Swiss-Prot record:
InterPro entries in the cross-refs: G_ENGA, GTP-bd, GTPase_Der, KH_dom-like, KH_dom-like_a/b, P-loop_NTPase, Small_GTP-bd
UniProt xrefs under NCBIfam families: GTPase_EngA, small_GTP
Name of the encoding gene: der
Species this chain originates from: Trichlorobacter lovleyi (strain ATCC BAA-1151 / DSM 17278 / SZ)
SUPFAM superfamilies: P-loop containing nucleoside triphosphate hydrolases (SSF52540)
GO molecular function, one term: GTP binding
Entry keyword annotation includes Cytoplasm: no
Binding residues annotated for GTP 2, in chain numbering: 181-188, 228-232, 293-296
Superkingdom of the organism of origin: Bacteria
Keywords of this entry: GTP-binding, Nucleotide-binding, Repeat, Ribosome biogenesis
Protein's name in the database: GTPase Der
UniProt binding sites for GTP 1: 9-16, 56-60, 119-122
HAMAP family named among the record's database cross-references: GTPase_Der (MF_00195)
Complex and partners: Associates with the 50S ribosomal subunit.
GO terms of biological process kind: ribosome biogenesis
Length: 449
């Protein structure tokens, strides 16, 4: 496991801005509304050849009656517990607050390195005012401006000095799994059930998860990163600026994923939004599993599952290869099947086929059904080879790449899927012209007809 560095502090002190500054890209949503980051947000960062996991947390309010703020406080406590190093961030412009004193008092009892960091120090006047934070009884304080990249390098240098020179043992390749779906279909509840503890703030209010939240975990000796995304609405439905950020972030999470768990609500059936979301997954070329949640709420007979499967396969013809799991995140019904299917489709997503086996199937397909003539010329095929994975990608060499029309491409694709399965994963066929040699031995590419 990599070392973990957690950023904690009151709401709206600039934790997400600092997180984004260190990561080097806009990963957490930044907005002036307190409580924007509700869950822990993870990113892998490497500096001086030392990789570590940076954690952004929701605002920490030591005493509050607000249920959401209480849940955010619990998430911050979990982050502090799992961290190797803690960055306690405060706000120079707001000054030292009673809540800061409460958090500092709690951190004094923590047996791990704590960096006391005062943010929003944008000038000499503010620098002088920041001296009041020494009243916390600390010996060393860092003054920074995350928004203007002031003092960040020195802070990072001190952090890196505390981290191991070599990655800790047990680092394996991580499979990224994005949990996607409409708002309030139970994505966060599903994540919490899969992980076995309340990793993500689960709340019945639609749109609770605003950021895409990463969680690293191990299942059957394999490493995974589970990405809980904000609910994706259609463009016309995203009125608030913050919600638009969340939708964009969710789409980016699909791009980062190897596998997408497309969560459907059994109570609602299949909606147009569900089809749009599945379309995003298909266009991104990701492996996927349909997870039909809230299955416990339906009255069922021995034909209910069959009818639902038929409906999914009809509405999502373009993802007909995806397995379907019927679960209840609330009761835990069949939850174990989700990771079983996700692990299997992830393996298929990275699968390689031997060249000999590939060409045997390819030759049989071509001999069984020749490609139509193109511009009165016969389309000749030479050989096929696998050129990539995630998804599996095959190059097919022919005398007329443009002459292999869509119906014949589908035919070859169906023959490949019949032979190799590729459960839960798309694959790509690339048609390329083969190079020929001229009389003097030089190679030339076939001209396209």
């Amino acid at each position: 496991m990599k070392s973990i560095v957690a950023i904690v502090g009151r709401p709206n002190v600039g934790k997400s801005t600092l997180f984004n500054r260190i990561v080097g890209e806009r990963r957490a949503i930044v907005d002036d509304m307190p409580g924007v980051t509700r869950d822990r947000n993870y990113a892998v960062v490497e500096r001086y050849d030392k990789p570590f996991i940076l954690v952004d947390t929701g605002g920490f309010e030591p005493v509050t009656e607000d249920r959401m703020l209480q849940q955010m406080r619990e998430q911050s406590l979990l982050a502090m517990e799992e961290a190797d190093v803690i960055l306690f961030l405060m706000d120079a412009k707001q000054g030292l607050t009673p809540a800061d004193n409460e958090v500092a008092s709690m951190l004094r009892r923590v047996d791990k390195p704590v960096f006391y960091v005062v943010n929003k120090v944008d000038g000499e006047k503010v620098e002088n005012e920041a001296a009041e934070f020494y009243a916390l009884g600390i010996d060393n304080m860092h003054t920074i401006s995350a928004a203007h990249n002031r003092g960040i390098r020195d802070l990072l240098d001190e952090i890196m000095a505390l981290l191991p020179d070599e990655p800790l043992p047990g680092e394996d390749e991580v499979t990224n799994i994005a949990v996607v779906g409409r708002p309030n279909v139970g994505k966060s509840s599903l994540v919490n059930r899969l992980l076995g503890f309340e990793r993500v703030v689960a709340n019945p209010v639609a749109g609770t998860t605003r950021d895409s939240v990463d969680t690293f975990f191990t299942c059957n000796k394999k490493r995974y990163c589970l990405i809980d995304t904000a609910g994706i609405r259609r463009k016309g439905k995203t009125s608030q600026k913050l919600e638009k950020y969340s939708v964009v972030d969710a789409l980016k999470s699909i791009e980062r994923a190897d596998v997408a768990l497309i969560v459907l609500n059994a109570e609602d059936g299949i909606t147009e939004q569900d089809k749009h979301i599945a379309g995003y997954v298909y266009e991104a070329g990701r492996a996927c599993v349909f997870v039909v949640n809230k299955w416990d709420t339906l009255e069922k007979d021995n034909k209910t599952i069959g009818k639902f499967v038929e409906q999914i396969q009809y509405e999502f013809k373009f993802l007909a290869f995806a397995p379907i799991v019927f679960v209840s995140a609330r009761t835990g019904q069949r939850i174990h099947k989700v990771m079983e299917e996700a692990a299997e489709v992830a393996e298929q997503y990275s699968r390689r086929v031997t060249t000999s086996e590939l060409n045997r199937v390819f030759k049989e397909a071509v001999e069984a059904h020749h490609a139509p003539l193109h511009h009165a010329r016969r389309v000749k095929f030479y050989f096929a080879t696998q050129v990539g994975v995630k998804p599996p990608t095959f190059a097919i060499f022919t005398n007329q790449p443009d002459g292999v029309l869509t119906p014949y491409q589908r035919y070859l694709g169906n023959r490949f899927r019949d032979a190799f399965g590729f459960k839960g994963t798309p694959f790509r066929l690339l048609f390329r012209g083969r190079e020929r040699k001229t009389a003097d031995g030089r190679e030339r590419k076939l001209s396209k007809q």
